C-alpha cells in the first residue's frame, strides 16, 4: 500500500512540474514571437552546436532515466530523452511520441505499441561507424529491464509493482522481464499484473525513456 501511495504522490508531483515547465515554455514561445522582428534582423539561419546556458534554482542530480528522482533532473531529461508516449504541453493529455499508435486489451492489462520507423539515436562513437541506428522495440525492452533491475537503488520504481514479472526479474529469479515482449522491430507489448490507470502516464515520464544498449555499455 505504501508503494502505491508513494507512486501516486510522485505521479502528481511530476504532473505539477510538467505544468510549470510547459507553462514557462509557452510563455517563452510568446516572448520569442514578440522578438521575431529582432531575430529576422540578425538573420534566419539556424545555428547548430555551441553551448546553451540555462539558469535554474537547483542543480540536477542525474539525467540518466534510471536515476531520475528530482524535479530539476526530470525537467532537463525531458528535453533530452524520448519514450513511447509524451504529455501534450497544452493540457497534459497523453500523445504519441516514439510510439505512433497503441492499443489496450479489454481487461486493461495488455498494452501494444507500434513504433515509428523514422526515429534514430544520435550519432555517437558507441555505434558502428559512429552512426546512430534506428530505435527498435528491443531497445525499449532493454531499457525497461534495466529500469526494473537491481542496478539502480532509487527511492521508488513505478514499474516494479505493475509490470508482470518485474519483482521476480529484480530479484534475479528470471533472466528476462516476462511482462514485456518484442513482437518485431516495431511492435512491443507490455503486460500488467492488474489494471493501473496511471500506467500510461508513467510511460510519459523521463524515467521511461529509451536508451541504447551500446551507449549504456560504453558510458554506464
Model-derived regions, located:
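Aromatic- and charge-enriched surface segment that lines or borders ligand/interaction sites
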Residues: 100-156, 189
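C-terminal motif of bacterial Sec signal peptides marking the signal peptidase cleavage site
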Residues: 20-23
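Immediate post-signal peptide segment of exported/extracytoplasmic ligand-binding proteins
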Residues: 42-53
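Bacterial signal peptide processing site
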Residues: 25-28
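N-terminal lobe/hinge region of extracytoplasmic solute-binding protein
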Residues: 55-106
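A structural "hinge/loop" feature
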Residues: 58-74, 98, 125-129, 156, ...
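Bacterial N-terminal signal peptides that target proteins for export
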Residues: 2-11
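Surface-exposed binding/hinge segments that line
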Residues: 138-141, 146-215
